[in-house]
């Protein structure tokens, strides 16, 4: 088996790469995917989003090592093991990231990845329904929509933000990237619009694209050049030959793992594992970043939440309606209102993210209380805490060692305490007077810094946005793994293109910027001139220097 380009992983970036690298018909593309098909309602029905993440069939099911600042809990760290990768098991929330995020990338050594550079790629990939004219793409493969916004609790949340003095935005992915507004979703015609649906399946209709379902064990490197990929398929070991390049798009956990198994990574660690060092790159597996969040939950005094739909019978009714018409409650992820806020004056960009949900549920999808309720997922998005991905053993089937070092900076605790108190302020606004019941979580008795910290240690969870473990940077940066053209430094014909190359985590969810990374990397791989830089300047809050709102 051979192809011009061999892509490891069919996730958000990998699917986009397969689509763009094969677009002109001149190059053969082979995609290696360890998972399987995405067929069936568990993935395709938006309201069923909790199911695929809980199924070993679709999820690698990783856990962190015990986190010392979180009562030594092992934090769940899901990654998609299916075509579409994590875009097939995520919450379908679409966030590009803030302009300052990408300007920061360039400052950190990723030349050519500033906001002006990446905005044209976001436009190229989008098919926006209702986004801000001039700022959004309208004919790309990735459909992006807003929900129906019919539940009164959604409107109450946005109105509460206004009453508290915060900005509102008609399109947080457009010019005004701060405030309360409608959440955007990767949903189209009532179905999850994953990277597989948007990019991979159309690409596979071309004669020059093929997918192999197998487990990539290592990259074959000969005389400093990547020449293929060793895979395990059906109990047999095979080698897929790359005539031009190998591109790794296997996730922020598995991309560094695969590089290390192939001899690319921190030299001492590789020697400890008995792996021959092909390129000593200490940055491989370092710089692990993520977002954390907690659920703030409140009883609703009116029966307007989704609580009535939680019993199995009514879930079945919603599922049947979706199967018949692709409509009803099953056609939404129920994340239809959100906010991006600054925690303090003087900040250039929002650092707090809110997802609002018109029901109070636990992480396992069960009701948090035997009553109607509502909640927000809230978190600080710009933590300075950094972790690592290392090998557990030289066995390719062994899970990687994930150490996030969550909450290792004093600022993290300060910001999350602020999240608790700010949410109480928001839920205390007049907009919620008709709905506000008792506080379920954290609970009204949790007031002091010490009480809030104890709550956070037990209830903070990952928002499932890992990145940064194969950092993109300047060639003379000893911790950079890839250069700004996504080429692995020290090995020819090898690239990495997924969220692992982010120099710094972006605000919000990472599916959007991961797809953009695949889009832009494809142009670098093909030697194309990058899309023309944008001269559009996003809105800047005129009160930013003196106010948080």
From Swiss-Prot:
Record-level GO BP terms: glycine betaine biosynthetic process from choline
Binding site for FAD: 4-33
Entry-linked InterPro entries: BetA (IPR011533), FAD/NAD-bd_sf (IPR036188), GMC_OxRdtase (IPR012132), GMC_OxRdtase_N (IPR000172), GMC_OxRtase_C (IPR007867)
Pathway: Amine and polyamine biosynthesis; betaine biosynthesis via choline pathway; betaine aldehyde from choline (cytochrome c reductase route): step 1/1
Disordered: annotated span: 529-549
Cofactors required: FAD
Class of enzymatic activity (EC top level): oxidoreductase
Keywords on record: FAD, Flavoprotein, NAD, Oxidoreductase
EC number: 1.1.99.1, 1.2.1.8
Identification of the protein by name: Oxygen-dependent choline dehydrogenase
Native source organism of the sequence: Rhizobium leguminosarum bv. trifolii (strain WSM2304)
């Amino acid at each position: 088996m051979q192809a011009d380009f061999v892509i490891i992983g069919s996730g958000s970036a990998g699917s986009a790469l397969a689509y763009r690298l094969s677009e002109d018909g001149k190059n053969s593309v082979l995609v290696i995917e360890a998972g399987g098909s995405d067929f069936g309602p568990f993935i395709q029905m938006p309201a069923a989003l909790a199911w695929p993440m809980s199924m070993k069939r679709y999820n690698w099911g990783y856990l962190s090592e015990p986190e010392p600042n979180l009562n030594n809990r092992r934090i769940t760290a899901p990654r998609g093991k299916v075509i579409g990768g994590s875009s097939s098991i995520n919450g379908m929330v679409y966030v590009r990231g803030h302009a300052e995020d990408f300007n920061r990338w360039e400052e950190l050594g990723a030349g050519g990845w500033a906001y002006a550079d990446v905005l044209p790629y976001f436009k190229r990939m989008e098919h926006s329904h209702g986004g801000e004219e001039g700022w959004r793409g309208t004919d790309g493969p990735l459909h992006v929509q807003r929900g129906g916004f019919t539940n009164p609790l959604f409107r109450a949340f946005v109105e509460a933000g206004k009453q508290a003095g915060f900005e509102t935005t008609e399109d947080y992915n457009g010019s005004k990237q701060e405030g309360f507004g409608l959440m955007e979703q990767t949903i189209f015609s009532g179905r999850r619009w994953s990277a597989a649906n948007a990019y991979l399946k159309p690409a596979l209709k071309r004669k020059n694209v093929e997918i192999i379902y197998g487990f990539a064990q290592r990259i074959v490197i000969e005389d400093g050049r990547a020449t293929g990929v060793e895979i395990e398929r059906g109990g047999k070991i095979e080698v897929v030959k790359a005539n031009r390049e190998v591109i790794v798009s296997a996730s922020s956990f598995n991309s560094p793992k695969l590089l290390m198994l192939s001899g690319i990574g921190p030299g001492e660690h590789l020697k400890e594992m008995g792996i021959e060092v092909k390129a000593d790159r200490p940055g491989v597996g370092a710089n692990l970043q993520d977002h954390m969040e907690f659920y703030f939950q409140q009883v609703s005094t009116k029966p307007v939440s989704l609580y009535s739909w939680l019993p199995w019978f009514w879930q079945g009714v919603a599922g049947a309606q979706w199967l018949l018409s692709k409509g009803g409650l099953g056609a939404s992820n129920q994340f239809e209102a959100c906010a991006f806020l600054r925690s303090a004056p003087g900040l250039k960009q929002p650092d707090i993210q809110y997802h609002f949900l018109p029901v109070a549920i636990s992480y396992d999808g069960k009701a948090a209380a035997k009553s109607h309720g509502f909640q927000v997922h809230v978190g600080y998005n710009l933590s300075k805490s950094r972790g690592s991905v290392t090998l557990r053993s030289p066995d390719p089937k062994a899970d990687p060692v994930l150490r996030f070092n969550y909450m290792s900076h004093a600022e993290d605790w300060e910001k999350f305490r602020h999240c608790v108190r700010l949410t109480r302020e928001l839920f205390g606004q007049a907009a919620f007077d008709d709905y506000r019941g008792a506080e379920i979580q954290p609970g009204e008795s949790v007031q002091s810094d010490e009480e809030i910290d104890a709550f956070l240690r037990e209830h903070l969870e990952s928002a499932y946005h890992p990145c940064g473990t194969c950092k993109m940077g300047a060639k003379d940066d000893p911790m950079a793994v890839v250069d700004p053209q996504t080429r692995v430094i020290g090995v020819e014909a090898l690239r990495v293109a997924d969220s692992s190359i982010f120099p710094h985590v972006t605000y919000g969810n990472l599916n959007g910027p991961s797809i953009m990374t695949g889009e832009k990397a494809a142009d670098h791989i093909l030697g194309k001139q990058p899309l023309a830089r944008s001269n559009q300047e996003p809105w800047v809050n005129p009160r930013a220097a003196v106010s948080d709102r």
